Amino acid sequence: MYSSTGLSSEQITDLVARIHDLREAPASRAGRKPTLGLYKCVVVALIYLRSNRTQASIADQFHVSQKTISRTIASWTPILGQALQDCTPTVDDLDVTDPLIVDGTLLPTWSWRSMPELYSGKHKTTGGNVQVACDLTGRLAFISDPMPGRTHDAHALKETGLLDHITTGQLIGDKGCIGLGMITPIRAQPHHHTEEEKRFNKSVNAIRYMIERVIANLKTWRILHTDYRRPFTTFPETITTVAALEFYRNTF
């Protein structure tokens, strides 16, 4: 179960119980018996978020129509997030004295012609810019809401509120964060670093590998790794849900 959903059977059972307590399960059409029960609806949504498989292939697995899977994903993805909203820390929940490593990542989407702001010149593709933070042990600490892909990491970081809440000297970033008061590698002309600067940059980069590993783990939810295919209006709620699931599975 874990390989297809990202959660253990015990975690799924607990998640189903949380949703049952919400009493917000989508109503079935009048006079119709639900095609999938609560447990299977949760599993379907998890499989989609974890693997980003086509709805048709998931429909074949559960012996239902593609439309049923489409409705299930649309209805239950936000419910998963609601059931786990207490698992996701906000900026205000973070310890102001806890050193954090921060980095931005692009979550790819389709190239909608009507949304040129999604194009990232840095990554040469379209998507949403998300800021991720972890502590010095590599524990995930924060995931921001998505911003348009063209947003520079420094601006995106300012928008998260992290710089206002955490002492900037406690934040570690890359060269894109130079000028924000954070600990970053030193920028110099090519081949003009002093030996001391080289040692400093090496020590910073040795720490920053933690956030790269955290982001890689986050993107094992393949819905965040490959082009997002559902309507863009559902993109923010999908990220919110996946963020909650990632925090949940790490703290259960």
Where do the model's predicted regions map?
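Charged, often Cys/His-bearing segments associated with DNA-binding zinc-finger transcription factors
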Residues: M1-A30
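Short secondary-structure transition/capping motifs
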Residues: S4, K33-P34, I47, F62-S65
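Ser/Thr-centered flexible coil motifs
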Residues: S8, G37, H193-E196
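A short, structure-level motif marking secondary-structure boundaries and short turns
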Residues: A30, Y39-C41, F200
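Short, amphipathic alpha-helical "recognition" segments used to contact nucleic acids or chromatin
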Residues: G37-S51
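Short, well-ordered secondary-structure "scaffold" segments embedded in the functional core
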Residues: S57-F252
